[in-house]
From Swiss-Prot:
Domain notes: The N-terminal domain is essential for RNAP assembly and basal transcription, whereas the C-terminal domain is involved in interaction with transcriptional regulators and with upstream promoter elements.
Name of the protein this chain belongs to: DNA-directed RNA polymerase subunit alpha
Protein family (similarity comment): Belongs to the RNA polymerase alpha chain family.
Record organism: Daucus carota (Wild carrot)
SUPFAM superfamilies assigned to the protein according to its UniProt record, in alphabetical order: C-terminal domain of RNA polymerase alpha subunit, Insert subdomain of RNA polymerase alpha subunit, RBP11-like subunits of RNA polymerase
Disulphide bridges: none
UniProt keyword annotations, A-Z: Chloroplast, DNA-directed RNA polymerase, Nucleotidyltransferase, Plastid, Transcription, Transferase
Amino acid sequence: MVREKVTVSTRTLQWKCVESKADNKRLYYGRFILSPLMKGQADTIGISMRRALLGEIEGTCITRAKSEKIPHEYSTLVGIQESVHDILMNLKEIVLRSNLYGTCDASICVRGPGYVTAQDIILPPYVEVVDNTQHIASLTEPIELCIGLQIERNRGYLIKTPNNNSKDGSYPIDAVFMPVRNANHSIHSYGNGNDKQEILFLEIWTNGSLTPKEALHEASRNLIDLFIPFLHTEEENLHLANNQHMVPLPPFTFHDKLDKLRKNKKKRALKSIFIDQSELPPRIYNCLKRSNIYTLLDLLNNSQEDLMKIEHFRIKDVKQILGILEKNFSINLGKKPKMGFESLAQLIDSKSG
């Protein structure tokens, strides 16, 4: 455990980690201060930071398990001490750390007798187990246990739909994509009268997939991303001189869909429309955001080739973006999008290969 003496700056706003400890591999604690703040500022920052820590940070979980030998979720298997339901609950508790976008596959294939733990999960290189000792199942006989797993990175909660008699032996698992287990803030006031100031104390507990300091940094970045749109003045966006940045939105074929948006008779101030208003899936939104694409204008200033060059971007992501443009901004794409991307053939082949 590391604990430092709290010293307060009288000039520049500063933050500092004053205490940190790891109770075990799946429980980290950190205590931070931010000062000096004017009266009321500590509560403003503390409330928003706590919500961002608990709700805006992505985590990685096992969301589905598949085995053809399982008749239903509440069955028991010969040679395995736990029921299928117990195994699924144990898989739900596995803590993972990753740089994953979207979903990926993993597997378990173990022969008994013996214990099956998290270290037996066969993972892609960009996913790792935080605690290899986490228990999954106990094999009491020389049988083989093989389970296919789906791993997903997301935020918030994923509640499974009832699926007790899956025909293909695939069972969804409730997921809690929350690396931060708890977060609290408290305020210490000092000074008198008009010189009264505040110190904000933030306490963060994580599950080990992120350290408290990493969680604090990520929550701060997410809050900044949410507030960036307010840095663009409304008049600047809506009253552009000489129709600058006005982009036409006509009907067009899929082959030229992004390039020809600028030729529509219906013009809009696209610089004022942000991509987070467009119901984009989190994976696509995060890919665009990491490529500095924040507004619809930014999006339309990129060609199909540019979008396909974005890391982890796929041809179906481009199609999904176009579907959302059609739905939300009255862009008529015709009956069925065409697949003729001659200029993108090499890029698509290289991504699929």
